[in-house]
Protein backbone atom coordinates (compact mmCIF):
# COMPACT_ATOMS: atom_id res chain seq x y z
CA UNK A 1 0.00 0.00 0.00
CA UNK A 2 1.32 3.41 -0.97
CA UNK A 3 2.16 5.86 1.82
CA UNK A 4 -0.11 8.87 2.27
CA UNK A 5 2.48 10.80 4.27
CA UNK A 6 2.46 13.82 1.95
CA UNK A 7 -1.33 14.03 2.04
CA UNK A 8 -1.35 13.49 5.80
CA UNK A 9 1.14 16.32 6.36
CA UNK A 10 -0.79 18.65 4.04
CA UNK A 11 -4.05 17.85 5.86
CA UNK A 12 -2.37 18.42 9.23
CA UNK A 13 -1.19 21.88 8.18
CA UNK A 14 -4.64 22.69 6.78
CA UNK A 15 -6.57 21.72 9.93
CA UNK A 16 -3.96 23.29 12.24
CA UNK A 17 -4.25 26.62 10.39
CA UNK A 18 -8.04 26.33 10.25
CA UNK A 19 -8.16 25.99 14.05
CA UNK A 20 -5.97 29.07 14.51
CA UNK A 21 -8.03 30.89 11.88
CA UNK A 22 -11.23 30.12 13.81
CA UNK A 23 -9.69 31.38 17.06
CA UNK A 24 -8.52 34.59 15.38
CA UNK A 25 -11.94 35.42 13.84
CA UNK A 26 -12.54 38.26 16.35
CA UNK A 27 -9.56 40.12 14.85
CA UNK A 28 -11.25 40.15 11.41
CA UNK A 29 -8.10 38.89 9.70
CA UNK A 30 -8.05 36.34 6.92
CA UNK A 31 -5.68 33.41 7.22
CA UNK A 32 -3.47 35.04 4.60
CA UNK A 33 -3.36 38.23 6.69
CA UNK A 34 -2.40 36.65 10.00
CA UNK A 35 0.13 34.28 8.40
CA UNK A 36 1.76 37.27 6.69
CA UNK A 37 1.78 39.42 9.84
CA UNK A 38 3.18 36.54 11.90
CA UNK A 39 5.91 35.96 9.29
CA UNK A 40 6.84 39.65 9.12
CA UNK A 41 7.14 39.71 12.90
CA UNK A 42 9.36 36.60 12.99
CA UNK A 43 11.77 37.75 10.27
CA UNK A 44 14.53 40.35 10.76
CA UNK A 45 13.23 43.94 10.50
CA UNK A 46 12.34 45.54 7.19
CA UNK A 47 12.42 42.48 4.96
CA UNK A 48 11.92 42.91 1.24
CA UNK A 49 8.74 41.66 -0.38
CA UNK A 50 10.80 39.03 -2.21
CA UNK A 51 12.33 37.70 1.02
CA UNK A 52 8.93 37.63 2.71
CA UNK A 53 7.30 35.78 -0.20
CA UNK A 54 10.04 33.13 -0.04
CA UNK A 55 9.67 32.78 3.73
CA UNK A 56 5.91 32.29 3.47
CA UNK A 57 6.18 30.08 0.39
CA UNK A 58 3.94 32.07 -1.94
CA UNK A 59 4.40 33.93 -5.20
CA UNK A 60 5.20 37.62 -5.00
CA UNK A 61 2.05 38.81 -6.87
CA UNK A 62 -0.13 37.03 -4.28
CA UNK A 63 1.87 38.63 -1.49
CA UNK A 64 1.52 42.11 -3.01
CA UNK A 65 -2.29 41.87 -2.84
CA UNK A 66 -2.11 40.84 0.82
CA UNK A 67 0.36 43.61 1.64
CA UNK A 68 -1.91 46.15 -0.08
CA UNK A 69 -4.75 45.04 2.21
CA UNK A 70 -2.58 45.12 5.35
CA UNK A 71 -1.34 48.59 4.41
CA UNK A 72 -4.94 49.77 3.94
CA UNK A 73 -5.69 48.49 7.46
CA UNK A 74 -2.72 50.52 8.76
CA UNK A 75 -0.83 47.42 9.95
CA UNK A 76 2.25 47.74 7.73
CA UNK A 77 4.16 50.35 5.77
CA UNK A 78 6.29 49.82 2.68
CA UNK A 79 9.10 51.98 1.46
CA UNK A 80 11.59 51.81 -1.38
CA UNK A 81 14.93 50.21 -0.57
CA UNK A 82 17.82 52.68 -0.72
CA UNK A 83 20.08 50.16 -2.51
CA UNK A 84 17.50 48.93 -5.03
CA UNK A 85 14.69 51.26 -6.01
CA UNK A 86 12.70 48.31 -7.40
CA UNK A 87 12.61 46.58 -4.00
CA UNK A 88 10.14 47.46 -1.23
CA UNK A 89 10.91 47.06 2.47
CA UNK A 90 8.09 46.07 4.83
CA UNK A 91 7.66 47.34 8.36
CA UNK A 92 4.97 46.67 10.96
CA UNK A 93 3.23 49.75 12.35
CA UNK A 94 2.47 50.48 16.00
CA UNK A 95 -1.17 49.66 15.24
CA UNK A 96 -0.06 46.11 14.44
CA UNK A 97 1.54 45.56 17.89
CA UNK A 98 -1.60 44.46 19.79
CA UNK A 99 -2.73 42.34 16.86
CA UNK A 100 0.67 40.65 16.62
CA UNK A 101 0.59 39.95 20.37
CA UNK A 102 -2.86 38.34 20.06
CA UNK A 103 -1.88 36.34 16.96
CA UNK A 104 1.30 35.10 18.66
CA UNK A 105 -0.63 34.24 21.82
CA UNK A 106 -3.27 32.26 19.92
CA UNK A 107 -0.65 30.45 17.84
CA UNK A 108 1.39 29.59 20.93
CA UNK A 109 -1.55 28.39 23.03
CA UNK A 110 -2.99 26.40 20.12
CA UNK A 111 0.39 24.77 19.50
CA UNK A 112 0.56 23.82 23.18
CA UNK A 113 -2.90 22.26 23.07
CA UNK A 114 -2.19 20.38 19.84
CA UNK A 115 1.08 19.02 21.20
CA UNK A 116 -0.37 17.99 24.57
CA UNK A 117 0.50 14.39 25.36
CA UNK A 118 3.53 14.49 23.06
CA UNK A 119 6.92 14.61 24.78
CA UNK A 120 9.61 17.17 24.00
CA UNK A 121 11.78 14.37 22.62
CA UNK A 122 8.97 13.27 20.30
CA UNK A 123 8.49 16.83 19.07
CA UNK A 124 12.24 17.19 18.44
CA UNK A 125 12.26 13.88 16.56
CA UNK A 126 9.34 15.01 14.40
CA UNK A 127 10.98 18.38 13.69
CA UNK A 128 14.18 16.58 12.69
CA UNK A 129 12.34 14.21 10.37
CA UNK A 130 10.43 17.06 8.74
CA UNK A 131 13.76 18.86 8.25
CA UNK A 132 15.19 15.79 6.50
CA UNK A 133 12.14 15.56 4.24
CA UNK A 134 12.46 19.23 3.35
CA UNK A 135 16.18 18.81 2.64
CA UNK A 136 15.46 15.84 0.34
CA UNK A 137 12.81 17.83 -1.51
CA UNK A 138 15.15 20.81 -1.90
CA UNK A 139 17.90 18.56 -3.28
CA UNK A 140 15.46 17.00 -5.75
CA UNK A 141 14.29 20.45 -6.88
CA UNK A 142 17.88 21.58 -7.37
CA UNK A 143 18.58 18.59 -9.64
CA UNK A 144 15.90 19.70 -12.09
From Swiss-Prot:
All copies of domain HTH marR-type, residue ranges: 2-135
Regions recorded as binding DNA: 49-72
Keywords on record: Activator, DNA-binding, Repressor, Transcription, Transcription regulation
Gene3D superfamilies linked: Winged helix-like DNA-binding domain superfamily/Winged helix DNA-binding domain
Transcription regulation is among the record's keywords: yes
Presence of the UniProt keyword Membrane in the record: no
Subunit description: Homodimer.
Family per record: Belongs to the SlyA family.
Name of the protein in question: Transcriptional regulator SlyA
Organism: Serratia proteamaculans (strain 568)
Gene designation: slyA
Amino acid sequence: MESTLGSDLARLVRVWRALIDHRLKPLALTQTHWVTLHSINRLPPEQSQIQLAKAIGIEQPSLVRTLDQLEEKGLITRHTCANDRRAKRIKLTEAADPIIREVDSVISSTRGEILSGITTDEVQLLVGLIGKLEQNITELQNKQ
